[in-house]
Amino acid sequence: MLKFIKSSTKESEWLKNPKNEICFVGRSNVGKSSLINALFKTRVVKVGKTPGKTKLINFFEDERGNSVVDLPGYGYAKLSKEAQSEISDMIFEFLTKRVEIKKLFLLIDSRLGFTPIDQEFYDFLKEAPFEIIIVATKRDKLNQSQTYQIKKSLDELKVKYFLVSITKKEFLQDLVNNLFN
């Protein structure tokens, strides 16, 4: 079970003294909110059909008091350049100043692989003091050859990754087992 704690846009509003904090980040419409709902078997995280729905940093807590953070999506082209910049700045500020983060789950669309903006984001974060785990979503949309290609490209990064289907609820249990350990 997961419960909503608060939303914020600036550091003074962030959740204070979280326990065991994990964060989910990725491009708009990659499935961050849907993945959190699937992993925690809840519907507490608002999911929108339109990209760019999450514009705030949303803090949740599980039944053990662990903190789960749903960050806004980056790179949504239909937002103004100013709005895109504000969201990117908010994400970068959070990820560079937030010392409580234990793990960051970077979501990518497995159909697209690592896009230039995903690569830029990963390059920025790879020296961070927390573990980065790649979650390639929308596995159900891939054929066998495409699945092989995305696995091959992720293997080359030499980083822990999971290839999942949120809609079919496939390959999620291994990810659940890696959330807080």
Swiss-Prot record:
Name the InterPro entries on file: G_ENGB_dom (IPR030393), GTP-bd (IPR006073), GTP-bd_ribosome_bio_YsxC (IPR019987), P-loop_NTPase (IPR027417)
Q: Which organism is it from?
A: Mycoplasma mobile (strain ATCC 43663 / 163K / NCTC 11711) (Mesomycoplasma mobile)
Q: What positions does the domain EngB-type G occupy?
A: 18-181
Q: This chain belongs to which protein, by name?
A: Probable GTP-binding protein EngB
Which keywords label this protein? Cell cycle, Cell division, GTP-binding, Magnesium, Metal-binding, Nucleotide-binding, Septation
Query: HAMAP family under this entry?
Result: GTPase_EngB
- Record-annotated disulphide pairs: none
The task this protein performs is described as:
Necessary for normal cell division and for the maintenance of normal septation.
Q: Does the keyword Nucleotide-binding apply?
A: yes
